[in-house]
Amino acid sequence: EYLNSVREEVILYTGLNYNIDEIGSLKRDLTLYLDMEVLFDIYGYNGEVFQRLALDLFKLARDANSKEKRVRFRYFEETKAEIDLFFAKAEEIVKGKVLLKDNVAMKAITNGCQDVSDISDRKADFYTKLQYSYGIIQDERASYYYKSDTDANLEWTFSEEEKKDLEVQFAVKMISHINKLRNNKPFY
């Protein structure tokens, strides 16, 4: 899991670095959709190493945005729901209803919390910092299931085996949303 997370961070970092290595090389707007783990990395919930990598990504974006804002960061409604569930589990841990498992982010969130209101404060701080310090907001689109999105929908491509794996389903759903935003066309 740790190696996969590092790999994902490196892919994001390399992709941005390649596209904006030369100032002005980004000719069109680029919106990057971040998942829960990357958002936790930015905030520091997954430790200093991941936070440094995530902040390097923001430095690259800031450099690319020096002339005009081309790079934006967003997260999907489903990602927000995943984060909200994570914080709800943290509340259950603070209440003593669930045991704390070996999860770096969960430990960071629950550390020092005496009651549920402490978790609520941390959740509010998390979303506030994402928006006002980093400009990361939830995607504004109301739905990804309009009739006009049918051709770009990749969710129907699940194999029977993949339909059983919730993580694969979630990943394909997010990729499908991005494909719909791009109208089934590559970025480059």
What spans do the regions from the language model cover?
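Active-site-proximal, substrate-binding regions of enzyme catalytic domains
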Residues: 1-187
